[in-house]
Amino acid sequence: MKYTKLAAVALASVMMLSACGQSANSDNQIVMTVGDTQITESEFNYYMNTYKENYNMGQAKKSSLEYCQRNQLIVEVAKAMDIKLDSDTQSKLKDYQKSIKDSYDREGGYKKFLKDNNLTDEYIDTLASVSYYTDALKKQTETPTFTEDELREYFKEHYRRVKYVLISTIDSQTGDEVSDDKKEEAKKTAEEVLEKAQNGEDFDTLISDYSPNTANDSDENGYIFTDNETGIEFEEGVDSIKANEFTLVQSDSGYYVIKRLPLDESQECFEEEYENEAETINTTMQNNAFYEQVQKWADEYGIKVTVNDEV
């Protein structure tokens, strides 16, 4: 699979956050308003550019909107609740802010970075504070615990298991898209593979013949993924079919012929795959519960979110 998760490192986190919350100017349309804060098109595009390195365009926009709104809500709620950072946290925050600026100085200049991205020094300081306000807000609510049954149910509802053939439309040497003629050839090949699969030909053999060296080629359990982990087209394609059915999906990287596989306790691989994901699922469910609480606080304080769908 050509899609990867964003690295959970401090500098990458700041880059992802850096499209949220800057004051509007007359040159940019407003993409989103969260409370009193307007998010401009240039800010959103900077955020999008970070996600496009890891996701296709559709998923990048979806994730950008979600995380931009989520992070700005945290800031607005913290302000509304008059959350203050203690002296130790403020000291850590200043060190973190300095490390961010130093890292950009090593990469060509912090001031140039601000100018190129239409950002301000004060804004970068605000970005760095988001994780600290998150920690402060978490102290205002209890961290939920989940039963084994709840974790297993989440796994069954939010994870999918598939095998697929990828007919790529990306030149393996240059990384660029192939010509339109070659794209048409790829489409015809994918349609042939789909027809063969639907006519009962062994799908593992089709994978080996048409799509070796992919994420599911050497794994008999197939490829297992969860919400927002692949491109929107791939996820929606899988969700449109039942177990042991096939579909054809076009994406930025080519044409996927997908077979959806069962994922429940009747499958031999279920326990192994569940155990691999259990810790991640628990963390995800705790985070989801926290963000639901943030939204409740936002509602209580009258903090509204408006998205401009025309931009």
What does each model-found stretch correspond to?
Residues 83-89, 202-209, 247-249:
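Surface-exposed patches in mature extracellular/periplasmic domains of secreted proteins
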Residues 1-6, 10:
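Positively charged n-region of N-terminal signal peptides that target proteins for export
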Residues 189-232, 262, 268-272:
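Peptidyl-prolyl cis-trans isomerase
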